[in-house]
Structure formats: C-alpha cells, structure tokens
Amino acid sequence: MADDSGTENEGSGCTGWFMVEAIVEHTTGTQISEDEEEEVEDSGYDMVDFIDDRHITQNSVEAQALFNRQEADAHYATVQDLKRKYLGSPYVSPISNVANAVESEISPRLDAIKLTTQPKKVKRRLFETRELTDSGYGYSEVEAATQVEKHGDPENGGDGQERDTGRDIEGEGVEHREAEAVDDSTREHADTSGILELLKCKDIRSTLHGKFKDCFGLSFVDLIRPFKSDRTTCADWVVAGFGIHHSIADAFQKLIEPLSLYAHIQWLTNAWGMVLLVLIRFKVNKSRCTVARTLGTLLNIPENHMLIEPPKIQSGVRALYWFRTGISNASTVIGEAPEWITRQTVIEHSLADSQFKLTEMVQWAYDNDICEESEIAFEYAQRGDFDSNARAFLNSNMQAKYVKDCAIMCRHYKHAEMKKMSIKQWIKYRGTKVDSVGNWKPIVQFLRHQNIEFIPFLSKLKLWLHGTPKKNCIAIVGPPDTGKSCFCMSLIKFLGGTVISYVNSCSHFWLQPLTDAKVALLDDATQPCWTYMDTYMRNLLDGNPMSIDRKHRALTLIKCPPLLVTSNIDISKEEKYKYLHSRVTTFTFPNPFPFDRNGNAVYELSDANWKCFFERLSSSLDIEDSEDEEDGSNSQAFRCVPGSVVRTL
C-alpha cells in the first residue's frame, strides 16, 4: 500500500488503489470477458470472501471512527428535519388544555423556545423520568449508558447490551479515555443518587424522621420539645443533618467550636452519606432560622435536609441518653455539660431537687415585694435554671396551691409590717424604694400655679398625714383638666395607698380596701357620692373607728386611713352638705394643668420629687427621725426561713 507507482495526478474523489487497478487493466492488453473469473494467484492472496483479516493500523481506526461520527451526525440531522417537518409549530393553542404537549415530550429544544407559557402539574413534572424524552438532549454519556443498561433487550433477558449505537467499532484509544470519564461520572452519580431520592420525596420531613430512626434506633421526637415558631430563640438546639460529605465531617468539630459553649457530636453513615446528630449550646440565643443558616453553611447542605428543635430538658431519660452517649467512644463532646443534664444525672443534684420548701418561696416573694399570684408563678418559674427550690416547684403537681398559699402568706406579712409602722416610718420606708434623686420645687410651683398658699397647705397636710380627727379628709375640687387627679394619684402612688371607687357602692364590700391601706383616694366624687358620704360615712370622715364589712369574713373595726377626694363639686358652697364642711378640708384648683410644646407636663409630679419633698419638709410635717433613730434601727430584716444552727466545738 506504500507503493505509489502509477498514481500521479490523483483525483480528489478517488483513492490510490482504484487508479492502480485501472492501469493494470489497460496495460496488459489481455481481453477479459465479463463472465470470466479473475485469477486468484495474480496477487498472491485469497480473494474469495473479500475480507481483509490483516492487522488494522491506527490510521484506519481513526478513519473509521471519523466515518462513524459523520454518519451519526447525518442521521441526527435527518431525524431533526423529520421532526420539524411533521410536528408542525412549537406553539400550543391557547384553548388547548393539554398538559403534556407532543413537541415538549419529543424535543426539549422545541419546548425551550416557546414564547407562551403552559400550565403544568408541578408535582408530576418536577422529576421527569428519562423514558418521557427520547431526544437525549441534556443527558451526559454516563446517564445515557445507565439508561441503556437499565432498559436492556427483553429477548436477551435484559442484559443491558447496547445495540446499533456506533460505539462498538470505535478505536481502542478513544474507548480508554471515555471509559475513565464514565467511571468518574458513575461514581459521582452514585454519590448523588441518595440526594435525588431525598428530593423526590413528597414529605421530606417525614422521610428524615424515618431515616433518623433507622440510623440511631430512636425517634427524633423523643429527644426534643418542638417549637411551632421559627423565630423563637433558645440557647440549646438538637440538630440532625443528612447527606453530609465525609470531608466536612472531619472538620466540623473545629468549625463549630468558636460558636458554641457545649457541643455533643455523633456521626453515622447510611446510603445518603454522613448523618450528623449534635446537641449544641450557642454562646447567644438563636432562632431556628439562624441555626439553619449557620449550620447549613458549615455543613454545605440545604436547610430542608436538617431537623432542628430544642432539647427536652425536663426529662431524666433524655438527659441520661446524652450523658451515656457523651461518655462513650461514639460521640465527641466539646465544653462543659449543660446544667439540665448535670442536674438530672448527678445524684447530689437529684436529691436536692426532691423537696420543695414553701418558706423559701414566701421569703423570695416578700423580699421582691410580689403579692399577686400570677406574678409570683411567672417570676418564680423563671428561676428554675439556677434555684433548686424553684426547680422542685416546677416538678411538683401542686403548683397552683403553692402559688396561692405563697401569695396569701406574703400579703399577711406585708399587712402586719404596714400596721406596725407609724406614718413617718412608712414614708421613710416608701422613700427607700425610690432610687433616683428628685426636686421638691416643681410640687411647690404647681401649688402656686393653682393659687394655693403653700404654708396653709403644709399645715393642713401635716394634720391629714397624722389622721387628726375632723382633719382626716382633704378634697381637691375645681373645673375639669386642672390636674386634680394627677396631683392626688402621684401622691397616693408614692405613699403606696389604695384607690376606691363609688361605682362599686352597690356592693357591701366596696370599702374593704381601706382595711389594708395606709392612705386612700376616692377619685371623681359626683353628687350621688357626696350624698352617700353625707348619709353613711360621716363617722369615717371624722377619722374615728368604724366597722367595715368584708367578704367571707366577719366585720372588722378600723380607723379610716387619711382620705383624699377629687371632685368637680365644691361642697363648701353647697348648703345641703353643711355637715361635711367641718369634716372635709377643701382646696380649689382653678387653672388648667400646664403643658409645654411637646405635650409634656411643665411641673413633674414624680416619685423622686415627692421623696425629695417629704425629706426637705420633714420637720414641718413632723415626720423627721427622732434622735434615737439617727444612728440606725436595731431591728433585723424580716425572715420567714428557719436558720441553720451552727454548733461550736
């Protein structure tokens, strides 16, 4: 084949052997008939079957591969022309409601160039199988090979051998390179098959719960207390992640350490890859959304591939699970265990939590001046993380009874303490509850604004504070919006008094709050109220002892505390209330209450200012401390908790 004799001026469309054969025929001069067979010994080869069994060189292999590709391209172009010819326009009629259009099923290229939108069933079209599209567009060589292997010839038993694909006659070098690419792609496809299976699940969360139970042998719900809101914050979180790459598993401990105070990490493997179970306590409280974004970035997995809930901390079984797995070699633990695990697994803490002491709860409520049942229950429950008695209270089935008993006992102690104090001791005690420093001048300026002489007002206030008979009631009267209620409410608030209302006068017990108060206020007394007081309450206004009816209790004898009354009616000018003139001291506020441009009060009547007012004028009001009390009181703070006796050796 290397001999090129007689092949000069070759044509562009003919090969060398054709020209040689033609020259031989014309130079021999032998007349060969068409019916006569050729001599088999002329060339020295057996030309019977016309098959050359000699070794095929590399050039011929590449030529055959090129010819194969050219034929495949030609066939593909022919098929595309037929599709364009017989399928018609790629546009679908607007009145057609066919979800699976013919052109979109045959060729994704035609479906991609549509200008009109077509409604599709999302759930059924989200993951199309390869059988629905026969064009092969967009599929890699690995996917095509997998498809052929899966759908083999049924006559051959489904052995998956490919027929008429053109790859059987390609060269050895091309096959070797493509085989390496197939192996790499097949490995990658095998790694992602589990993730694709997860994405195809209708309920991913249920699937994750099932996989978690298969891996760890217990339900994820058994370890957590579910949060309905994704915005609720918590410091402790239980996270289960699926489909994690093994390279991330090795570095996760170092990645999570700067963000957490404690981390309990467990790794297992399944068909989807690495599975992570971690109990983590962050340095700051985080919501579920924040935890999902943080761990999703560290683990390089989608947020819907994780189960994130806070742990169930009020369960000894759950705490024991984390404790036992933490000391085994199957887990990696970072930091100190949370107190709720230590509390329920260490014997000393368990014994301390077993008994509840009501006296400690009452002492706490008394020290914090909390007497309302709802406030006691809420505030004391929040101490469960660091107070053993509060923890025992939370574990008790009698919380409502304990709260009620605590509130009753606290009110009894507070009432007895108030009754024991004189008015000057009470004012000093109320002043200790105000931390800020005020100014007494705004109160004096407000009284001058209402045309009230300060010295006469101070003398009347002194008699009122000490409960002098016939001077036990002060009435602030005047037109509306003059600051009567504001002035009296601020004074009652500082002195810790009570407020009664005539709206409850139909009840026999509407005066019952007077039994537990040091001072009192009756706001906005109308004509019927003054009539009622003139008829039934003359003895009370005198400041003399009188009996008060209390609900579910016997009548009690009390001395009415100093009483403030606000009204728009000036009883000093009403003749029909002449019997109240000597019992009620009246001050008139004629001017409107002043405000600045921003709507703030010009004269601030705050607790700090009232504290400064009584401290500044204590000598004029006869409430200053005596010489015996200047060095401090010798009385100890109230204690209702039994103390421990220390025996000396």
From Swiss-Prot:
Region annotation Disordered: where it falls in the sequence: 146-188
PTM per Swiss-Prot/TrEMBL: Phosphorylated. Sumoylated.
Effect noted on mutating S93A: About 60% loss of nuclear localization
Gene Ontology CC terms, in alphabetical order: host cell nucleus
Entries under PROSITE patterns matching the protein: SF3_HELICASE_1
Superkingdom of this protein's organism: Viruses
Keyword DNA-binding: yes
Catalytic activity: Couples ATP hydrolysis with the unwinding of duplex DNA by translocating in the 3'-5' direction; ATP + H2O = ADP + phosphate + H(+)
Motif (Nuclear export signal): 106-115
InterPro entries reported in the protein's UniProt record: Helicase_SF3_DNA-vir (IPR014015), P-loop_NTPase (IPR027417), PPV_DNA_helicase_E1_C (IPR001177), PPV_DNA_helicase_E1_N (IPR014000), PPV_E1_DBD (IPR046832), PPV_E1_DBD_sf (IPR046935), Rep_E1_papillomaV (IPR016393), Znf_lg_T-Ag_D1_dom_sf (IPR037102)
Keyword terms, alphabetized: ATP-binding, DNA replication, DNA-binding, Early protein, Helicase, Host nucleus, Hydrolase, Isomerase, Isopeptide bond, Nucleotide-binding, Phosphoprotein, Ubl conjugation
Protein purpose: ATP-dependent DNA 3'-5' helicase required for initiation of viral DNA replication. It forms a complex with the viral E2 protein. The E1-E2 complex binds to the replication origin which contains binding sites for both proteins. During the initial step, a dimer of E1 interacts with a dimer of protein E2 leading to a complex that binds the viral origin of replication with high specificity. Then, a second dimer of E1 displaces the E2 dimer in an ATP-dependent manner to form the E1 tetramer.
HAMAP family reported in the protein's UniProt record: PPV_E1
Annotated protein name in UniProt: Replication protein E1
Organism: Human papillomavirus 11
Organism phylogeny: Viruses, Monodnaviria, Shotokuvirae, Cossaviricota, Papovaviricetes
Gene: E1
